[in-house]
UniProtKB/Swiss-Prot annotation:
Part of the 30S ribosomal subunit. This is Small ribosomal subunit protein uS8c. GO terms for biological process: translation. It is found in: Plastid, Chloroplast. It comes from the Eukaryota. The gene is rps8.
């Protein structure tokens, strides 16, 4: 039984948001790099750094907060498809999150992308997570 790196990344970000922690370290894999890139492009995180410590590749995410109370830009981050229950969708059935305010991150045959990109390119895939 292997580790679910996507669930580990989501849980680390969620826990850091609850504790108002600015940086999060997650194991760097191709999937976590692509998810971090999407979160950065959509404005949910400030930036991310691909760091190599000893023999481990680590991805350092700088989370984004607003105001003096440090309200997080990421309200909810939830895993959809899990290793025990994969959930796939074609481009017509990809769910809209909060009427388009949030995003769904998908793994497609053309890489990891947001729901808007997948609808535009008319391709479906595995629904990885919701972000809003």
């Amino acid at each position: 039984m292997g580790n679910d790196t996507i669930a580990n990344m989501i849980t680390s970000i969620r826990n850091a948001n609850l504790g108002k922690i600015k940086t999060v370290q997650v194991p760097a894999t191709n999937i976590t790099r692509n998810i971090a890139k999407i979160l950065f492009q959509e404005g949910f995180i400030d930036n991310f750094i691909d760091n190599k410590q000893n023999t481990k590749d680590i991805l350092i995410l700088n989370l984004k907060y607003q105001g003096k109370k440090k309200k997080s830009y990421i309200t909810t981050l939830r895993r959809i498809s899990k290793p025990g229950l994969r959930i796939y969708s074609n481009h017509k059935e990809i769910p809209k999150v909060l009427g388009g305010m949030g995003i769904v991150i998908l793994s497609t045959s053309r890489g990891i992308m947001t729901d808007r990109e997948a609808r535009q390119k008319k391709i479906g895939g595995e629904l990885l997570c919701y972000v809003w």
